[in-house]
Every structure is written in C-alpha cells, then in structure tokens.
Amino acid sequence: LTDRLATLCRHGAGVKRLGRAKGPAIWQYNGCQMTSTVLAILGGKRALGGKVMEESDLIPVLRRGLPSTAVDELAALLGFTREQMAECLALSKRTLARRRGQARLTAVESDRLYRLARVLARATDVLGNTAKAARWLRKPNRALESVPPLTLLDTDLGVRQVEAVLGRIEHGVYS
C-alpha cells in the first residue's frame, strides 16, 4: 500500500504539466490526485462504497460514516496501535473498541479520520514517501511551537497550521 500511495502522490490523476517548453516541468494540481490518495489511505473506493471521483463526492460518504476498517488502514500506514489512533481521533479507547464491532464510524469521527488521511496524503506528497511522512507527523516541529504535527490534527485550525508548514516545506521556505 505504501508503494501504491507514493505512486499516487507523485503520478496520480489530476496532475498535468504546464507549458510545452523543454526542461524542468511546472506541474499543476487540480484536486483529483489528492482525492485518489486519500481514498487509497482509507481503504479504496470499494471499502468506501459508491462512486467517488472528486473531493465533493466524499461529503455524503463522511456524513454516512466511514467504515470502521478505515481506522485500521490508516493505523497500519502510520504504524500506530488502536490506542494511538484513539488519541489522534480524540476518542476514548473504549469508544474506538466499540466502533470496531460496528459497521461505521459516526459523521464526526469520519471527518476527523478524513482530516488525518488528508494530511498524511499531503505529507507523503511533500516528503516523498509514507514512512517519512509518518515520522514527520510524530516528530516535534519548531514551526509548530515544538509539538508533533499529529497532536494538532484534532482541530480544523491545527490541520490548517500543519498544512501551512507542509506548504512552506514544499516551496523551500525554512520550517
């Protein structure tokens, strides 16, 4: 899965070369690539059910609730235990254990899991592979007041701050 994820990040649908000049390419991102990568992280189209072609197609899926198996998919990519995933999703261990017996997460839990998957996809794209991305998410970051990026992903503001740091890294700005 990690090789497939890295391939999707680097060469997925939705990325096109701008201009006809020879030499270094200038690439444009149009949204499909990130959606494909997030889908792969969460278990693929088959696991999510329905036809998901772009990010807006995920809204009804998130409202319905992601399959509880998506937690295990993401935990495996990050190298996390279910207890660590419970912490990332701001859930108690007991609540996450109950979800394992159920078919779906709640809409709120699904949204949190989606945010985590989206940040992992972005970090994988910027840093080159899933292992580096997972390590970066767990390591304290000076640009984020010396806290691990993963600890900020339980809020929308935290996610935006982490994505901003990834954007700076991507563009070569010291972070």
Where are these regions (language model features)?
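Non-transmembrane "mature" sequence context
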Residues: 3-8, 12-175
